[in-house]
């Protein structure tokens, strides 16, 4: 026997239709757009190196504020007024044949000319410092570019700015490794792996030497005032050497911008007794027990000098860091500890 048919069941409402995902239509890029195409890069996570790292980076980075623009505009108007008044005085002195006033106007014109020349020189140096940031952005774009024709000229400009001679072995190896079929990304990557490490190694040596000198000097100096003066002098000298190494000449106002960072470093030179308290994490029990207070302060000042050098190196470097190229503070810390161990081992018991 067959079972009877079940009655129908009526469901309220309408059936849900499957939702098809809407995709954007294909977009064809023209020649210039294809050359400038670069994949989107997600925002990097904030660095967890602490507030001291932020202070160092803020002091090294060139910045423009509204107050600075207002002061610049006021000084410009004042300078124009002074020049106009000077021209009027000169004309009056010439018409009345007042030779004393005319000589004073000539002396004032010489002083104003010297001042304008100095300001122009400082502005050019500040502009060059800001241009280095734009060059890093351009290099970052070239690292993602698959076009050709721009990478070689860009790298040759960087080598010329750094003062690298055409006969330098590293530059000759780079010329031998590149060819016309390579993209800008490949050419700049080869420059970053062959030529740029030559300058980076020199900057690392400068940082290591300055940090070691700061450590040893503070460890043996009995006067806090001498420590502060030595730290200030060594840090300014380190910044100048790193900037000159990468082809940047710092001016007077650039040094003033870094002066508060130097003051911060000097203040830490007097408060680096904390290194003694965390010394067990860095060194063995035996070495931490043999460290004196002055030696611990020297290690703290040396580490802060190394941190300052790393940030100055990052600012003056024309290429962004790749992979693990960025120097780590721990590397300099191990060097300082090794030098301190050697010094303590040579010290008569």
Swiss-Prot record:
Where is this protein found? Cell inner membrane
* Keywords in alphabetical order: Cell inner membrane, Cell membrane, Membrane, Transmembrane, Transmembrane helix
**Pfam families registered for this protein in UniProt:** DUF697
Membrane-spanning residues? 70-90, 99-119, 213-233
Q: How does it sit in the membrane?
A: Multi-pass membrane protein
Sorted alphabetically, the Gene Ontology cellular component annotations on this record are: plasma membrane
Q: By its UniProt entry, which PANTHER family does this protein fall under? A: UPF0283 MEMBRANE PROTEIN YCJF
Can you tell me which family this protein belongs to?
Answer: Belongs to the UPF0283 family.
Name recorded for this polypeptide? UPF0283 membrane protein Ent638_2153
Q: Which organism is it from?
A: Enterobacter sp. (strain 638)
């Amino acid at each position: 026997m067959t079972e009877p048919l079940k009655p129908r069941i009526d469901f309220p409402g309408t059936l849900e239709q499957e939702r098809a995902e809407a995709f954007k239509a294909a977009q064809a890029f023209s020649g210039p757009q294809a050359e400038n195409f670069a994949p989107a890069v997600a925002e990097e996570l904030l660095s967890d190196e602490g507030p001291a790292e932020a202070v160092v980076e803020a002091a090294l980075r060139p910045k423009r504020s509204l107050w600075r623009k207002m002061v610049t505009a006021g000084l410009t108007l004042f300078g124009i007024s002074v020049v106009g008044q000077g021209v009027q005085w000169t004309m009056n002195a010439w018409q009345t044949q007042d030779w004393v006033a005319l000589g004073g106007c000539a002396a004032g014109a010489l002083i104003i000319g010297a001042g304008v020349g100095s300001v122009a020189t400082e502005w050019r140096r500040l502009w060059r410092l800001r241009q280095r940031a734009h060059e890093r952005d351009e290099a970052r774009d070239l690292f993602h570019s698959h076009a050709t024709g721009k990478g070689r000229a860009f790298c040759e400009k960087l080598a010329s700015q750094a003062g690298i001679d055409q006969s330098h072995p590293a530059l000759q190896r780079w010329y031998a490794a590149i060819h016309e079929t390579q993209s800008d990304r490949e050419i700049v990557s080869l420059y970053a792996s062959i030529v740029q490490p030559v300058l980076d190694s020199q900057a690392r040596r400068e940082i290591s030497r300055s940090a070691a000198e700061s450590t040893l000097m503070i460890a043996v100096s009995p006067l806090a005032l001498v420590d502060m003066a030595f730290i200030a002098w060594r840090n300014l000298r380190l910044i100048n050497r790193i900037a000159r190494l990468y082809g940047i000449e710092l001016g007077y106002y650039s040094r003033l911008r870094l002066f508060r960072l130097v003051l911060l470093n000097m203040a830490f030179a007097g408060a680096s007794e904390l290194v003694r308290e965390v010394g067990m994490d860095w060194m063995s029990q035996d070495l931490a027990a043999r460290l004196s207070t002055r030696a611990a302060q020297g290690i703290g000042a040396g580490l802060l000098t190394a941190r300052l050098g790393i940030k100055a190196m990052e600012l003056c470097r024309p290429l962004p860091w790749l992979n693990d190229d960025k120097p780590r503070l721990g590397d300099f810390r191990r060097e300082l500890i090794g030098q301190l161990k050697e010094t303590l081992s040579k010290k008569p018991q």
